[in-house]
Amino acid sequence: PRRSIGQQLNNPNDYRWSMRALLVAMNRWITDGAAPPSSRHPRIDDRTLVEIEALSFPQLTNVQKPTEAHKAYRVFYGLDFASKGIVSVDPPEANGSYPILVPQVDNDGNELAGVKMPEVSVPLATYTGWNLFNAESGPTSLLSSMQGSYIPLPRTRADRERTKDPRASIEER
């Protein structure tokens, strides 16, 4: 993986492998009436979707986890906006914000819910959907745009103990 505007290496996980299988399943659902695969998205009821303060990301040296996420505001553009796309209230009225929830992670820092790619099923790293800006690119407490992180696991138990990494090493798996 390469490094760009984020503090960590870029997440090399490629979603296209699962996309092909999902498109085949969707085609079977549409053409043959076959049941679609069950949903695997994070959910509040099973605690795989949590408030950012409840995120159990491992404490890793030189890895700063996000403490805030982009906030989505509830806005009102007028009565005709939803049905006709006509803006009659400009600027729009802000009516609060939506709750910010994030996917919960396992002991390696990989998301619990979702379609597990082979790299995540048998991990050699922590793969995140976020990467904070590095000092040369922006405020280091903010999420960089469209960048995930790749944080390699320690190779050996000795490496893990030397770096005080709480994740099991590759050797220990």
What kind of region is each of these model predictions?
Residues 1-173:
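C-terminal His-loop and adjacent cap/lid subdomain of alpha/beta-hydrolase
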